[in-house]
Structure formats: structure tokens, C-alpha cells
Amino acid sequence: MTESPGQAFHKAYTDDPAGARVSFDYTITEAFMPTKERPRVTVRNLLKVRPAADTTHFWQERRPPRSEVAGVSEAQLRQEATFVSGMASAGLHPVRAWVRIPDGLADDPEAFAEFIDYRLLVRLATAENQALTLGEHGILSHPDLTRLPYRGDFVAGVLAACNEIEQIGATAHAMIVNPYDWWYSMVGRSVLAELAANGTLISRTRMIAPGHALVGDFAVGARLLDGGRSEIRVEEPPPGTFATPGPAVVAEVWEGLALHLPTHFFYMTPVVDEGWTPR
């Protein structure tokens, strides 16, 4: 890459501040990562990527009705033997983030590019985290995701979810937690070093509620469908994006999610009425 998205957009903005538009033939959240100086695992980083141009058809396994489990030999020992295989499909959807350009910023090409690269693209990465977790097409929206209630200690709940994954012959490859639980329940305990030694990745994001965690075999169970195209442009944002109306700059990528194995993801949830409260 010879120039950053911010540098490319500055050229277009200088020529036409009201209608600037730059298209990219790659996904800018993948190709340019402003967090590289401050390493932090995004949800995208947990997933293998599959290029996609349109609707993608893929194989998927689901848990069967309880009435069918008894007919499978050694169903308790090898739970995955009971899973039912079929086909599913997923499309690409836009993921967008917005900023407004401060007056006078365009006079400084370096500062302008930095603002796009380190503010707009960071917000786009946040929007991507949201889309892949609790968005309409995210993992948490899948009807076959298993909810795993826990009582008491957060770390004990996380380890229980890891155990559930390995009891179906998979690996606790990664988890998504809220920063609150990372700092208050995980940092300062041996659990982070032990999970790292096991090869378990941890993404921390506000898109998972405090006290909750999404634990799964991300490497095997899902694929990020990457449209391989992006755009940064000047546009009127939807109502409610900012406190006042007026044009802004939007960054957009096109992505989807193929959840091959919803059986391999566990959403750990606290039993609130048993006494769990944020510190």
C-alpha cells in the first residue's frame, strides 16, 4: 500500500469537499489497522476470512431435537455425533462509521490523513465489532447459539464455557469479553497467562455486556465473508448520527458471517437474581 486511506481521501476532499468519494478494492479494516502500534485483538482477528461477492451458501451443523438424540450410539460420549448437517446462506451487509471534518483541517494534509486513519477507521473497527457480535447478522443473533448461565465468579463461568466446547470435541479457540471483566476479573490473575499458553485468543469490546462472554471455536466454527471493497465519501448521515444535521464523512465496508458451527459457541450469561452485580 503506497498511501493510507486517509491520504487518498484527502486528495479527493481537496478537489471536491462537498462530493468527495474514494473507492478501494480491499477492505480497509483488514488492510489498514490503526491499532497496530497498540496491539488489541478485534473480533475480525478471531475469524478466518472467506472472500465473497454476493450471497454465500455454506454447510452448517445444528443440534437435533432431544427426541432424536437417544437414537445415536454413544450420544453422551460424543455429542457431536448427534449434530445434524445441512446448508445455510448468508449475504454481505454494509458496515459504516461517521465523522465530521473540523473546519480548517483540510489545510494540513498530514493531520487530515491522520484524522481519517486514526479516528474514522477506529470508529469503523468499532462498528465492525458491533456488526459481528450483536448486530442483526452477528453471532449473538443466531437462534442456535447456546446460552450458558453461570453463578458467582466470572472466570469460573468462562472456564465452564471452555469445558463445554471441548466436551463436543472442539477447542476453546477464542472468547470475546467486555473490558470491564478483562480489567476487574481477569487481569492480575493467572488465568490470562494460562489461556495464552493454551493458545486461546481474547478480544475485549463493549459489544459484549459486562458479566457476559462469548466463547467458541472461532477458527473452525465461523468465517468472515469479506466483500473486498470499501468506500470513504461525503454524505448526509442518518438522523441521530450527530446532534445537528449536516454533511459528514462515512467509511463503509461490506461483510457477512457464515456460522458453520453454532454448536461450537457458548454465550455465558450471569444469573443476575443470584446476586451478580457490577463492581
List where the protein language model places each region.
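Assembly/oligomerization interface modules of large self-assembling protein complexes
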Residues: 6-95, 154
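Short, Φ-rich (hydrophobic/aromatic) sequence segments
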Residues: 28-37, 112-124, 128, 208, ...
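Hydrophobic side chains in beta-strands
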Residues: 60-61, 101, 177, 251
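Short loop/turn segments at secondary-structure transitions that flank enzyme active sites
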Residues: 64-67, 105, 126, 130, ...
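Short conserved micro-motifs at the rims of enzyme active sites and ligand-binding pockets
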Residues: 69-71, 111, 186-189, 214, ...
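Alpha-helical scaffold segments that mediate packing/assembly in large oligomeric complexes
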Residues: 78-168, 266-279
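Extended oligomerization regions of viral-like shell subunits
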Residues: 137-255, 272-279
